Amino acid sequence: FPHPTTIDRLLRQWRGSASGDAPDLDALYMATLTLTRMADGGLFDHVGGGFCRYSVDQYWQIPHFEKMLYDNGPLLALYAQAFLATGDDYFAAVANATADWMLSDMQSPQGGFYATRDADSEGEEGLYYLWTPDEVRELLGEADYAVFASRFGLDQPANFEGRWHLTVHRPVEEVAADAGVAEGDALAAIERGKQALLTARAGRVPPERDEKQLAAWNALAIRGLAIAGRALEREDLVDAAVRAAEFIRSTLFIDDRLLASYKDGEARFPAYLDDHAFLLDALLELLQARWSSEHLHFAVTLADTLLENFEDTAGGGFFFTANDHEELIHRPKPLADESVPSGNGIAAFALQRLGFLLGETRYLDAAARTLRAAWRAMDEYPHGHVTLLTALEEYLGHPEIVIIRGDGDETGRWRDAAAKLYAPRRLVFAIGRDEPSLPGALADRAAVDGDTVAYRCLGTHCELPVTSWEALAASLSESN
């Protein structure tokens, strides 16, 4: 199984040590090698983009072919962040392909995202994704086929029940050298091959799609698209994230209560901890890509609901079900990361960030109570509680928050320039000069007549505002 929270933790570990005397290059190596092997192997759909659920072999060649929204949202964010951290275009290409698949295959007309693509079609596992050399040769022609087959193992023995599931077998430079062509020409042949196979595959019977639209899983997709939109400079990804957030706000938020699921025109089931926490976290990422006072208000409503309806006021942390949910024999309070991040970990992480953004101690105190309640679990089993450890890191060393006020174009340019840096503990918000009254501490981050102004704070400590990009860039460089 992919473990995005663990790989994210490694990237954060490297970044936190990078400016010191002993940068943790092992953490960076482990993260980037894992991401490369995942993208080279059979987990990744090399034709259509997106990741399958898990590998069934130790070499990560053959997957269980089901594609889950809750995997692809976090993996999209992770590959985009890896691109920022390393500048490696391969990570950007994987992120772009994953995002393209999410938008083309998984986003509904209403704006939300569907839950899954099944593994089998026509009664066979993986049939939709498999090829034979003869099929590919006929589609590509001999010259492009020679390059494509060498790259993706079609010149090797079949790897899945007499057919070929594409995995990267050789680096492009070796493929080009063997074919006697320039590396750029080899890359072009590979891309032509992918497009030809994608077109041919569109004529096959696709796996069934589970068209439930789940609040928690949509939140993971919104977060991934918002992060990738900033990192890859793709406004279409931000547009898609905004559409999904608006779908949830208009369709799943009824009578001031969030619902968990939508299908066939009906929103159902009271939402759980994960729905509220994941969506709060996603909105904080989306606000950095595109400011919206409505989305900030929605985030505040979700945070207040967490405290009022989910918090264990006696022991700290958050229950999975709300106070008015049907009574259970045991009311769980999940702490560990599983197939999705820990709801308690994301709640603590996002509440801290919102608390520092607004100067709201209620959120900071609730996050601290959660971390104290989870301390024994983190201490005894740290690799099972990585999301909580990340929240603990930001509790011990507060997040850096940059507020940029001014005219839209200029504030956007400052924000976009700041977003080119991999700084996982930094939040950058560009808020227009004419934005209506802002809540909490944001009210003190006023626009200045005639100038763009930036306010930089570390936790509750704020520097003097600056009115030039050069001054802000110098401040950001010092904090890296």
Language model features with spans:
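Glycan-recognition and catalytic cores of secretory/periplasmic carbohydrate-active enzymes
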Residues: 1-480
